[in-house]
C-alpha cells in the first residue's frame, strides 16, 4: 500500500503529518510526504540552476525547501526516521530533481520501511493530481484548507482515497463516521476505517443513507458486514 501525505506549511501541517504518519505506521505502508511550493518563474529557474543539480550546489533554496526541512526535523524528533549521522540537519545534498522538476530525498524509516520527502512547485491541485496519477497512491492525506473550495477540488480531482485532517486535536476523544452502502468502494472504506480506528484507539459510527426501499436492504447488509469486520478486528463500533 502507498500513502501520500500532503503538507503546506510549518504552521498548519503538524497535525496532518502526525495523523498521516501514525496511519502509515499501522498500515505498514510505503509513504511519501509532499510539499507543493509556489511556482518558480523561468527567471528563477535559471537563477538557481535547477535542472539536474544537487541541492548543495544551488545558490538559493527553491520555494518549499524550508517546509521539507521542518518535516525532516519533525520525523527525526518523533522517531519516524533513523538518524543518519551525528548531524540532524536536513540532507539537502541528497535531494535530487528529475526532468519534471520533482525533487526527492529517500529516508531510512523506523516506523515504515519506505519513506521519502518530495518537493513539487506549481498549482497545488494539479501537482498533487499528477503525483497521484504518476506514482499510483492508494491513499492521500491532506489538511483541511481554510478555502473550502480547495478541499472540495482535491477530493473531486485526485484519483485516490482521500483522508482529510481538519483541526485535529490530540486531547479530544474523536469518533470515525463511516458511511457505507453497496458500492464497490465500501470494502476499502471499511478497511481504512478499521486501520485508522486501530491507529488512534477510537470508536467508529457506521451510517447508511437510503434513497429507496431497495437501497435500504442492500445498505443494511453493508452495515451489518462492516459491523462484523469491526468486531473481528477488536474495534468498538455503533450503527
Per-region residue spans from a language model:
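Structural beta-alpha unit
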Residues: 58, 73-140, 232-239
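Generic detector of short, locally flexible boundary/turn motifs and exposed helical patches
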Residues: 48-50, 81-82, 103-108, 128-130, ...
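Short secondary-structure capping/turn micro-motifs that flank functional sites
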Residues: 40-41, 91-92, 148, 171, ...
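Short hydrophobic/aromatic-rich motifs at helix boundaries and adjacent loops
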Residues: 40-45, 96-101, 162-165, 197-198
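Small/aliphatic-rich secondary-structure junction motif
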Residues: 1-66, 76, 83, 175-239
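Gly/Ser-rich helix-loop-strand patches that form or flank binding pockets
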Residues: 11-19, 24-26, 117-171
